[in-house]
């Protein structure tokens, strides 16, 4: 089935649907050549910290930010459009106004630039769209822009006092002349949190900073205008699986917005709901009412849905939505909503066969609308989560409830669409095929789409967004070129509603009927007439489920009359009628009447016929059941009865995973009773029961009951049994179980490995705790913490220029980090890592000389040292030399040398003895380290080391010479270059006592 990227739209046709309207392109206008577009890589958390720093503009989520979101609106004969300015270094918020009468284009450039993903301007953020509105009461322009659930504290406080961005103009600015349509018509922020003299962004819409908490953590702005001209704004509060829709109101007379009011509560679990949930859909003001339609994303990760499930719809009978909310049946709901089941319409996940956890995926291609006469249309898509599985399934669904009908018609005969807009009674699909616009239309309350327009030339477009007003489509488009600045266009497409007014008026007696299977009679008198004088109805054709029944060319247009009893699916009611061999079976059937007038114009009406089944009604005690592996007892009392008086139940058969267990032919239809304990997979529970040799093991089982009545008609019911085995939680692994760093460390980024040991289970989240306190929950692999957008998670200081120093770094000590992984069944596994933070060591110091031994009267002594620090951010302040704890000299820069040039005598004249030389190094953290050596000074001539020079030393001297021993050159007293007997006299002259000399 070919799938097109489409939009679904509706507009008025005065009660009839014409197939002959001439939809035309009325105008095409180039708005700019410089619309911002993200042309780089689609990043994730594993690489978002290293975006392209060149020309390419990398992005997170999606590449579109201009001609995206709530970006085009009309006011009188003007069309207003918002966009961001390309390229990468521009990014300004822009507002353009096109005058459809004069062709004049005016553009205002705002100082604010797109801040990028979580505050990084190098990474584009497609969710940060610009919402736009013009008050029809006072001509003020309102813009809310460039935000994604920001508050004062998240993302390192980057958005403090700037997490909500609202700009507005003075009254009447919307229709000022071209020369006066300028930036100064917008109101500056002069509050205490103003970002400067050119700040046109306001932190609240009320003007009161005391309300700022009401404007935090919001995303996706969209404005609406009520029937009396009041502006409403709705946004999403919170996150994907715990969020709420909130809305506020503009009082044009007071020129003031209210605070936001919730449609539903978030944190629903704390208010009694079994789980938290978020909304994926829209709030819209359509047909005079505020309405909501969405799919639910719950925090329950054990069901078969990967993300969203269900279709939910509600509307308010209050003119501004402040109360009186109801479901599609008109039944009151709790407001604010807590339990979403109060407004559930149906479950798209039932339209594919998968039942395993997280196997069903219904993200995207969802939207809804309501026509002017009250037809509700909802589109959705469901597919297998795993696109590679051999039994892959994908279904597009168009569910619609014609005005006056009680229930929805669910059709899978639908090619798909992405968004819906409404204005009247027709449904339109507007989209791009081959990059060029096309339009298809169907009458509201039907699924009969016909293509009525296709562009064949002109620019090829990449994407667009649209707004419909008074029968015209304002299609705001980005041309498909290249780079991060691409052209933007406005196309105005006329839907030709005037010709639709000439279409015939055709209707069934009722929009819906309900009959019992085997109904005898259904006669339908179809009303058809032309609203144009002089025209007449040429024919009326009846179709059932899109198959032609008959064409009638004369009044009355009666189908199913006495001569043709079977044509409406009835059995026949007269004695002359043979039983219908092909009566309409149980189910929902669409009757369609096509009226054609004398000018060839045609119109369609539809009716829903519900045929109630005569088959037995059969059910299990409950739809699903969980037991532990090895369960002893499972008794199932299956209910079965006939819907038709006089019939009886002949048998009920039980199947497990398609295999017959047993057929029971008498009440009660009880399986797994005491006489047959094993047939439902149980072990047995009485002393008389032997152990089941083939019990049901861990897994999911489909139980099916087939009931057959006395006429041979059968019905089935099913129950899912989950047999739980021993828990197999995810395995969590750190790269290293212990990491050691020094105090003040700049960077610590760690990727955690988490996987389930069970095939088919996915890791839904990894949560990091530091010393028992929550750090962050990551819901998208790779499970990377401490990356450049979260540099402080492991207590580091930060390492990029844009990182402010961590105000709370981890101190010296041992810290425990715990990673908790949760899988798609809700099981959790965890693992710890120990982080040891050491004090920064003092400097390393080395004295280059070993211990020194010298003789008195030595002429030189030098000591040198080298020192280094623990890291490059620390410097050496000084090295100081101490001799015997007395400072010699402190040196503040290398070379570190004492006794060298310019200081040659500072180490001379040391007395006899051993001296401690100590060098103390001091670094810029005031840490000190020391190294030491010994300097020994001996008395010259005291060869026997008795502290005097005497005859004993002279004898030792002469004996050494006789023995040829090498002597210190200092004993060359006569300076002839050798030490010999001639130096004995010199030694004698050094005798301590004069007597030695005379001797």
Swiss-Prot record:
Pfam families: BNR_4. Ca(2+) 1 binds at residues 189, 199, 201. InterPro entries: Dockerin_dom_sf, Ig-like_fold. The record marks 236 as: Neutralizes the sugar carboxylate group at subsite +1. One of its GO terms (biological process) is polysaccharide catabolic process. The active site is at 127 (proton donor/acceptor). Its EC number is 4.2.2.-. Induction: By ulvan (at protein level). Ca(2+) 2 binds at residues 300, 303, 305. Residues 1-21 form the signal peptide. One of its GO terms (molecular function) is lyase activity. It comes from the Bacteria. It is an enzyme of class 4 (lyase). Transmembrane segments: none annotated. Substrate binds at residues 126-127, 280, 297, 361. Keywords: Calcium, Lyase, Metal-binding, Signal. Ulvan lyase involved in ulvan degradation. Ulvan is the main polysaccharide component of the Ulvales (green seaweed) cell wall. It is composed of disaccharide building blocks comprising 3-sulfated rhamnose (Rha3S) linked to D-glucuronic acid (GlcA), L-iduronic acid (IduA), or D-xylose (Xyl). Ulvan lyase catalyzes preferentially the endolytic cleavage of the glycosidic bond between Rha3S and the uronic acid GlcA, but not IduA, producing oligosaccharides that have unsaturated 4-deoxy-L-threo-hex-4-enopyranosiduronic acid (deltaUA) at the non-reducing end. Belongs to the polysaccharide lyase 24 family. This is Ulvan lyase, long isoform.
């Amino acid at each position: 089935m070919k799938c097109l990227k489409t939009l679904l739209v509706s507009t008025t046709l005065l009660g009839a649907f014409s197939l002959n309207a001439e939809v035309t392109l009325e105008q095409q206008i180039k708005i700019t050549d410089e619309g911002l577009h993200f042309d780089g890589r689609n990043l994730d958390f594993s690489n978002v910290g290293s975006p392209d720093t060149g020309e390419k503009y990398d992005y997170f989520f999606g590449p579109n930010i201009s001609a995206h979101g709530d970006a085009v609106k009309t006011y009188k004969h003007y069309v207003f459009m918002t966009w961001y300015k390309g390229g990468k270094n521009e990014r300004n918020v822009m507002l353009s106004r096109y005058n459809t009468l004069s062709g004049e284009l005016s553009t205002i450039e705002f100082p604010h630039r797109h801040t990028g993903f979580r505050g990084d301007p190098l990474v584009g953020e497609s969710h940060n769209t610009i919402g736009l509105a013009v008050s029809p009461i006072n001509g003020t322009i309102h813009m809310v822009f460039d935000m994604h659930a920001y508050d004062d504290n998240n993302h390192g406080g980057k958005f403090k006092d700037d997490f909500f961005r609202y700009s507005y103009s003075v009254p009447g600015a919307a229709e000022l002349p071209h020369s006066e349509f300028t930036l100064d018509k917008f109101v500056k922020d002069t509050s205490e949190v103003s970002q400067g003299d050119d700040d046109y962004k306001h932190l609240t819409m009320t003007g009161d900073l005391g309300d700022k908490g009401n404007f935090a953590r919001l995303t996706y702005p969209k404005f609406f205008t009520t029937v009396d001209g009041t502006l409403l704004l709705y946004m999403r509060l919170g996150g994907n699986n715990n969020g709420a829709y909130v809305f506020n109101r503009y009082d044009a007379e007071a020129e003031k917005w209210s605070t936001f009011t919730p449609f539903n509560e978030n944190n629903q679990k704390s208010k009694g709901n079994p789980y938290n949930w978020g909304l994926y859909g829209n709030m819209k003001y359509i047909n005079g009412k505020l309405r909501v339609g969405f799919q639910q994303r719950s925090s329950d990760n054990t069901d078969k849905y990967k993300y969203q499930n269900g279709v939910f719809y509600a509307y308010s009978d209050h003119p501004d939505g402040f109360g009186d909310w109801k479901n599609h049946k008109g039944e009151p709901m709790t407001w604010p909503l807590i339990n979403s089941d109060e407004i559930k319409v149906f479950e798209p996940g039932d339209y594919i066969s998968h039942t395993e956890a997280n196997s069903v995926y219904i993200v995207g291609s969802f939207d809804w609308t309501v026509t002017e006469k009250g037809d509700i249309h909802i589109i959705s898509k469901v597919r297998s989560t795993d696109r590679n599985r051999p039994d892959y399934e994908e279904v597009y669904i168009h569910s619609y409830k014609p005005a006056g009908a009680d229930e929805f018609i669910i059709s899978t005969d639908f090619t798909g669409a992405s968004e819906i807009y409404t204005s009247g009674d027709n449904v339109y699909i507007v989209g791009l095929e081959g990059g060029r616009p096309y339009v298809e239309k169907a009458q509201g309350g039907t699924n009969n789409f016909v293509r009525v327009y296709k562009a064949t030339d002109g620019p090829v477009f990449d994407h667009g967004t649209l707004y419909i007003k008074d029968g015209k489509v304002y299609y705001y488009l980005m041309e498909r070129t290249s780079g991060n600045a691409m052209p933007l266009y406005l196309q105005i497409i006329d839907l030709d509603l005037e010709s639709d007014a000439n279409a015939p008026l055709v209707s069934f007696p009722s929009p819906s009927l309900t009959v019992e299977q085997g109904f005898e009679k259904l006669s339908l008198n179809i009303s058809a007439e032309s609203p144009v004088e002089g025209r007449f109805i040429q024919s009326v054709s009846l179709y059932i489920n899109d198959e032609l029944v008959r064409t009638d060319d004369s009044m009355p247009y009666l189908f199913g009359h006495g001569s043709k009893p079977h044509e409406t699916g009835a059995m026949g009611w007269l004695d002359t009628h043979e039983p219908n061999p092909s009566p309409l079976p149980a189910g929902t059937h669409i009757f369609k009447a096509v009226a054609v007038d004398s000018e060839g114009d045609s119109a369609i009406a539809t009716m829903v016929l519900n045929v109630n089944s005569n088959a037995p009604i059969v059910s299990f005690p409950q739809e699903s059941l969980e037991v532990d592996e090895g369960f002893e007892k499972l008794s199932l009392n299956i209910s079965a009865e006939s819907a038709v008086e006089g019939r009886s139940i002949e048998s009920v058969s039980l199947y497990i995973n398609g295999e017959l267990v047993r057929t029971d032919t008498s009440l009660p239809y009880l399986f797994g009773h005491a006489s047959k304990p094993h047939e439902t997979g149980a072990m047995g529970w009485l002393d008389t029961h032997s152990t089941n040799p083939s019990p049901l093991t861990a897994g999911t089982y489909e139980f099916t009951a087939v009931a057959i009545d006395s006429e041979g008609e059968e019905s089935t019911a099913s129950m899912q049994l989950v047999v739980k085995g021993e828990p197999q939680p995810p395995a969590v692994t750190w790269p290293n179980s212990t990491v050691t760093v020094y105090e003040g460390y700049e960077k610590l980024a760690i990727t955690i490995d988490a996987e389930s040991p069970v095939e088919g289970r996915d890791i839904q989240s990894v949560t990091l705790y530091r010393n028992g306190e929550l750090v962050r929950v990551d819901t998208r692999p790779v499970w990377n913490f401490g990356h450049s957008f979260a540099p402080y998670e492991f207590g580091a200081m930060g390492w990029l220029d844009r990182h402010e120093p961590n105000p709370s770094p981890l101190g010296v000590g041992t810290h425990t980090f715990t990673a908790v992984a949760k899988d798609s069944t809700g099981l959790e596994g965890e693992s710890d890592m120990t982080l040891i933070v050491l004090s920064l060591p003092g400097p390393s110091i080395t004295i280059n000389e070993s211990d020194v031994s010298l003789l008195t009267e030595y002429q030189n002594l030098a000591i040198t040292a080298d020192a280094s620090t623990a890291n490059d951010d620390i410097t050496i302040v000084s090295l100081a030399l101490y001799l015997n704890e007395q400072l010699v000299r402190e040196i503040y820069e290398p070379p570190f040398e004492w006794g060298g040039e310019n200081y040659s005598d500072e180490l001379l004249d040391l007395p006899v003895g051993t001296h401690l030389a100590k060098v103390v190094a001091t670094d810029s953290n005031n840490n000190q380290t020391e190294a030491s050596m010994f300097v020994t000074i001996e008395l010259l001539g005291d060869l026997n080391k008795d502290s005097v020079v005497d005859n004993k030393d002279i004898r030792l001297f002469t004996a050494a010479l006789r023995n040829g021993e090498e002597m210190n050159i200092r004993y060359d007293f006569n300076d002839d270059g050798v030490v010999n007997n001639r130096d004995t006299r010199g030694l004698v002259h050094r005798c301590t006592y004069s007597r030695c000399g005379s001797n």
